[in-house]
UniProtKB/Swiss-Prot annotation:
Naturally occurring in which organism (per UniProt): Salmonella typhi
Catalytic residues (positions): Y498 (o-(5'-phospho-dna)-tyrosine intermediate), Y502 (o-(5'-phospho-dna)-tyrosine intermediate)
Keyword Hydrolase: yes
Origin organism lineage: Bacteria, Pseudomonadati, Pseudomonadota, Gammaproteobacteria, Enterobacterales
Protein name as annotated: Probable replication endonuclease from prophage-like region 1
Role, per record: Possible endonuclease which induces a single-strand cut and initiates DNA replication.
Keywords (A to Z) from UniProt: DNA replication, Endonuclease, Hydrolase, Nuclease
This protein's record includes keyword Nuclease: yes
Length: 804
């Protein structure tokens, strides 16, 4: 372009710039130029609000649409793709949980605990949650791995030992699969299961009989073969059939087969009630052994027995007491005896039982002094393989899944072998044996034995040999954990004082409320209830006397003496009852309660039973049992030096339910009287219906306001279920009287003195403070103490006034 052209172009641009609409536009640069902001106006604000509302409405509609699609279209039942996606999600979560468990063994242990039945998992989870709340992860993990995991492993071994092969075979029958979960069942479930077992035994009997009884010509041996087939089915359930020892086949049988026992045995094996008792006992024992396996029976949890076994024993005792109070004994003449009084007067009363044994031990002590014998106190314990739990509450690694019953059988077998060896060596002793539980329920024995002084070392060495011969390597040179012996020094205490503590703490804990057990840390009196529940559950004989005449003849003689005293009437006290003077001397000794004289008159200690002068007589019961057989009952006493027997149970008593109270019977009369035994109408309606009659005739209810604490306690415990319901209804209908505020009355001088003392202690001494103290309140005085006014004195203590 030439210079002239450029001048012409520049002139054109200058001419164009003279107009605004023709000026050149500026180039846009977003990095350098600021964006122009639109002016704010009312219209722009309104448009912005409408846009926001439309956006929120659009989001709400989209969310609602998604919910509708997910509910009706994209769910597992309608959309297979969605279902497959959900399944893949669950599988991935399960794989993730499995991987976490594989790398975290604690979660595996927790899952195993939660998979256990409730009677196992609930108490274990409570302990696990406690350790988890401590905030110590290492201790929590160590507790799971070192305590909970071994407990679960031991639990599986115990279950395998309980369910034998034959027992599992019986559970494979139709309807009997509940046998596999027998420890987890309740009483109602066990009752239903026992009915099914009885029905199965009935079918076995029908199959065994076949056409055997089509004719009357049936031999007793054929009936016995039928019984053997039913008994074999019973043995598969680990239950010994009735009369099994008498009826089973023996290679060298000396006596003829008692075929008359077969009907009663078959009747029991076909009875649902009999099976319920057997299965319930088995269930309780198996359940207790499972709780022992997981360390829930120990000094750290519940000593001697589990907590639920203790509660069951209390409930059983309560039901027995209600049964005794609702029944009475009636004879042919119409005389009645309250059944509760009869039970309390018998040896079932713990106080009578304790007194009788203490009198017997005292008699042995007097005889030993007369003979010049020495007394030795022994303690025998089972090997460590019988103990399930250590003293610290952790599982014992040497435990071999043995039961409490097996530990008792071990001691019985050991003692029988020792007595055989002792008699073979010509050694004799007499005394008493006490069976006690360790904190985990394992049995150990205490023996108080009397013997000749020259035989003491030999007998002690022989007993030590039998007590430690099993698992001898675990003891080493110290045999104290298994066997202890102590020669009783008369200067320190008598033999009776040694054994008195063990007798009392295993019966009712009389006189031991202040002593604490070193093993459990509880009072010996409180432990007595647990010990009795332990002995009842595992069927352990707590006390056993040996080398002396039987105590049942002693009881029958005392009963005979009481009957003779009532019949003699005006005769002189101490007059002979029996014609034979030797027998009458034994009767007099028993009546006086002197066991020493009774034993010596019977022939003395270490005398075989066949040489005792008086023995217990038995007879066959006239009335048959529910199974058709006739049992054996006590008749009285008899003696080989006198003819005939002496009956001490001449009067036949029959147990009947007590008669209904007349007032209760009248309450159920009228047009609304029920046609059944009980009245199912609401109690409030009954009370309203008879309220007018009672108000007109006078209130015949017992006035409990005039009773003391003991009478009120006895009255409330003697009430039946109906009386309890009526009392509860009366309490709901009658409005309780509000107790007026108690305010102490003081003189003006005492009030001024109280105000002065309050001001001296730094209080205001106002009328409000004085009125609060006079009404029984208290005022905080600092350091956790409170002041209160009692007996015209201002006192200060950290306890509330009502606790005094």
């Amino acid at each position: 372009m030439s210079h002239a052209d450029m001048n012409n172009c520049s002139g054109f641009n200058e001419a164009a710039a003279a107009f605004s609409w023709n000026s050149p536009k500026k180039a846009i640069n977003p990095y350098l130029d600021l964006a122009e902001v639109a002016p704010v106006s009312a219209l722009s604000n309104l448009i912005t609000l409408y846009a926001a509302d439309n956006e929120q409405e659009q989001l709400r509609r989209e969310a609602l649409s998604d919910q509708v699609w997910e509910r009706y279209f994209f769910n597992e039942s309608r959309d297979p793709v969605q279902r497959e996606m959900e399944q893949d999600k669950f599988i991935s979560r399960a794989k993730l949980a499995h991987e976490q468990q594989r790398f975290n063994p604690d979660m595996v242990i927790l899952a195993d605990v939660n998979a256990q039945p409730s009677h196992i998992s609930r108490p274990l989870m409570q302990r696990i949650e406690y350790f988890s709340s401590l905030g110590r992860p290492k201790a929590y993990s160590r507790y799971l791995r070192e305590t909970i995991k071994p407990c679960l492993e031991r639990l599986e071994h115990v279950r395998d030992s309980q369910l034998s092969t034959s027992f599992r075979f019986m559970a494979s029958h139709e309807g009997l699969d509940g046998l596999l979960i027998l420890p987890e069942m309740s009483q109602d479930q066990v009752k239903r299961l026992s009915t099914l077992v009885a029905a199965h035994m009935s079918m076995c009997l029908d199959a065994a009989c076949g056409d055997l009884y089509a004719t009357d010509d049936v031999k007793p041996e054929e009936i016995r073969k039928t019984w053997e087939k039913v008994a074999a089915e019973t043995l598969r359930l680990d239950v010994i059939p009735p009369a099994f020892e008498q009826l089973r086949r023996k290679r060298n049988r000396r006596k003829p087969v008692p075929y008359e026992l077969i009907p009663g045995s078959l009747a029991r094996m076909l009875c649902a009630d009999w099976w319920y008792r057997k299965l319930w006992k088995m269930r309780c024992e198996w359940r207790e052994e499972q709780l022992r396996a997981v360390c829930l029976v120990s000094k750290k949890a519940s000593p001697y027995v589990s907590y639920e076994a203790m509660m069951h024993k209390r409930e059983q005792r309560r039901k027995s007491l209600e049964f005794f109070r609702s029944h009475e004994l009636v004879n042919e003449d119409g005389d009645t005896l309250d059944m509760e009084d009869v039970v309390n007067a018998s040896s079932s009363n713990p106080a009578h039982r304790r007194n009788e044994m203490m009198a017997c031990v005292k008699g042995l002590e007097l005889i030993a002094e007369m003979r010049g014998d020495c007394a030795v106190f022994y303690t025998i314990t089972c090997p460590s393989r019988f103990h399930s739990t250590l003293n610290n509450g952790r599982p014992n690694p040497t435990w071999t899944n043995t039961t409490v019953r097996q530990s008792s059988d071990y001691l019985v077998g050991m003692f029988a072998a020792f007595r055989k060896a002792m008699h073979k060596a010509g050694l004799r002793w007499y005394g008493v044996r006490v069976a006690e539980p360790h904190h985990d329920g394992t049995v150990h024995w205490h023996l108080l034995c009397f013997m000749r002084k020259k035989d003491r070392r030999t007998i002690t060495a022989l007993l030590r040999k039998f007590a430690i011969r099993e698992d001898r390597e675990e003891l080493g040179n110290n045999t104290g954990p298994r066997f202890k012996s102590e020669l009783i020094n008369p200067r320190k205490g008598t033999p009776t004082s040694y054994i008195a503590k063990y007798i009392s703490k295993n019966i009712d804990g009389r006189g031991l409320a202040g002593e604490i057990s070193k093993e459990t840390g509880k009072s010996l009196r409180d432990n007595a209830e647990y010990v009795n529940a332990w002995a009842s559950l595992h069927r352990v004989q707590q006390f056993r006397f040996f080398g002396i005449p039987g105590r049942q003849a002693y009881r029958e003689l005392r009963l005979l003496a009481g009957q003779a005293a009532r019949q003699q009437g005006d005769k002189k006290a101490g007059a002979p009852v029996l014609d034979n003077p030797r027998l009458d001397a034994i009767l007099a000794a028993a009546d006086a309660g002197c066991f020493a004289t009774y034993i010596m008159k019977q022939g003395g200690v270490l005398v075989p039973r066949k040489y005792h002068l008086i023995r217990t007589a038995y007879e066959i019961n006239e009335e048959p049992t529910a199974y058709g057989d006739h049992g054996i009952r006590i008749y009285g006493i008899w003696s080989p030096i006198a003819e005939g027997k002496i009956c001490t149970h001449a009067v036949k008593w029959k147990m009947v339910r007590k008669a209904v109270d007349v007032q209760e019977a009248a309450a159920d009369q009228g047009a609304c009287a029920p046609w059944t035994r009980g009245n199912n109408c609401p109690l409030a309606e009954n009370l309203n219906q008879h309220e007018k009659d009672k108000s007109a005739d006078g209130d015949t209810r017992t006035d409990i306001t005039c009773m003391d604490d003991k009478e009120l306690h006895d009255y409330l415990h003697s009430m039946g279920k109906k009386e309890h319901r009526e009392l509860a209804a009366r309490l709901r209908l009658v409005k309780p009287k509000r107790r007026k505020d108690h305010k102490q009355r003081i003189t003006e001088h005492q009030r001024q003195q109280l105000v002065y003392e309050l001001k001296s202690r730094g209080f205001d001494g106002s009328e409000k403070e004085v009125d609060l103290l006079l009404r029984g309140g208290s005022i905080p005085s600092g350091a956790g103490l409170r002041i209160f006014y009692r007996n015209q004195r201002l006192q200060e203590d950290d306890k509330w006034r009502d606790l005094y």
